[in-house]
């Protein structure tokens, strides 16, 4: 009887160890940002080895400015995604450090996690002009508001469209007015 209880305790411990989140070591950019006084969270690397870093919305512009000053001069992609119904929305920025002799330029992805109820983040249009239409698309599809953007209007959907079509909890209208093809 005592053997079975000790076995179940050992089983519970091994299950708990398996479920424990792995320790993620901060990459070079996260370490540099931490040394510069920012509070960031290392998210590890993606399947291609690109370092991912979580920052808060109130630090985003300062972090972006620091990265530009460190040579991350190219905004390869800005996008958004929905973590799932009832979960957070994410605005992400994929940055490269381009130079004349770069064979494989350093890359980093910055992510800002936002509440579904009021997804607001500062626009990085004034840091990277390339974020203009990309932020508009994230606004149009997910409802993420980029504060300070010079022209934050819908870019894909009609202006009178209701809702954010790429959110996972979006309920599509029952009727779409279709135009006949000519």
From Swiss-Prot:
Keyword Thylakoid in annotation: yes
Q: Where in the cell is it found?
A: Cellular thylakoid membrane
Indicate whether Thylakoid appears among the record's keywords: yes
Catalytic reactions of this protein: a plastoquinone + NADH + (n+1) H(+)(in) = a plastoquinol + NAD(+) + n H(+)(out); a plastoquinone + NADPH + (n+1) H(+)(in) = a plastoquinol + NADP(+) + n H(+)(out)
Keyword annotations from UniProtKB, A to Z:
Membrane, NAD, NADP, Plastoquinone, Quinone, Thylakoid, Translocase, Transport
Q: What interactions and quaternary structure are annotated?
A: NDH-1 can be composed of about 15 different subunits; different subcomplexes with different compositions have been identified which probably have different functions.
Put simply, this protein is called NAD(P)H-quinone oxidoreductase subunit J
Q: Which organism is it from?
A: Acaryochloris marina (strain MBIC 11017)
